[in-house]
């Protein structure tokens, strides 16, 4: 049996993820008038651009909802954000600057917590505003059915009758006004924005064109650090972790992780830390472009990785990075709670994060420009005396030890020389005239 409904199920309970914006307001009123019993659910994700969360359910009731609930998702979202930092679950980056998967993390929490609330109310049909070209339609589909296997999906934006009657924002605004709800369309921005406490995503419209850059974006979590008239002063910041958990900023201890994230957002946001411009592959393999903000995630990630490199050995760090790339893709695809993701995540949290105790001090400047000033941890395996260029007592190894180690390298050096000679004989390599360095025959550089 198909779980996707192509037309409105009249007379049935239908839940809608309600944002209070024009689209979901018009959809709620339209579904009510067409005979559905509409239940509205709003996720409080700590969106930085939302002024009054309590007003949103009240609006839903005015528009005809049978019931309207505000579901506080902030603690769970911050918990998942910290888990992503602990496991390095970030696979998209440009020039070493990462996208922190803040929207995929938000969808994982929204999709599970709202559907759980619907299930409590006897609502087994869910609608949201995701379009068929994006990632969210699949993320919400997966998380919804994981939470409630009896769930069916109804999306007004996939219903041809809804599209014919209310196909655009102008039609929606006129529809609301005609039914006694004065609803002015907000000024049209050059891009769309989606946000939560972990970060903000700016995409679509003008940002679909690669010759429109970050300068057209008005940050909602930071400052336009690229502007000459934007004053940004250098700031010294300390971040402390205990067994992988961020616990203190600038010496202030936080027992509430949400409060810590809000403060980290404020600190990082003063500098525009964590803003990035990324080209990525959507789930359906088409490329899209987004400009992202994530000041707290960036600040915590920098400090966490500094401790990782000072505490763990090379092979552990390699596995952490490789597994993190894979886990980041799974998160992006809406598979954050799949078994293969849980396996990678739990491994990093247990064997990497548990050792991460210490404090990192940074100097933040403009954007992603920063310096690390100090790194302290009782678990550091960094020991400068081991490699000191000065004469030290009780050295970890002697010149004679190194001679023996280098002599052992003769084995693999000899093997490598034989392979290079073999490749030259078969024509795979050729010696550059006047040089003893072999080159690939097809290397025209």
From Swiss-Prot:
One cellular component term from this protein's GO annotations in UniProt: cytoplasm
Pathway(s) where this gene product acts: Amino-acid biosynthesis; L-arginine biosynthesis; L-arginine from L-ornithine and carbamoyl phosphate: step 2/3
Record-listed L-citrulline binding positions: 99, 135, 139, 192, 201, 203, 280
Primary location group: cytoplasm
Keywords: Amino-acid biosynthesis, Arginine biosynthesis, ATP-binding, Cytoplasm, Ligase, Nucleotide-binding
Single GO MF descriptor: ATP binding
Pfam families from the UniProt entry: Arginosuc_syn_C (PF20979), Arginosuc_synth (PF00764)
Catalytic activity: L-citrulline + L-aspartate + ATP = 2-(N(omega)-L-arginino)succinate + AMP + diphosphate + H(+)
EC number per UniProt: 6.3.4.5
Residues the entry annotates as binding L-aspartate: 131, 135-136
Binding site for ATP: 17-25, 43, 129, 131, 136, 194
Gene Ontology biological process: argininosuccinate metabolic process; L-arginine biosynthetic process; urea cycle
Quaternary structure and interacting proteins, as annotated: Homotetramer.
Family matches, as HAMAP family: Arg_succ_synth_type2 (MF_00581)
Sequence similarity: Belongs to the argininosuccinate synthase family. Type 2 subfamily.
Official protein name in the record: Argininosuccinate synthase
Organism per entry: Afipia carboxidovorans (strain ATCC 49405 / DSM 1227 / KCTC 32145 / OM5)
Gene transcribed to yield this protein: argG
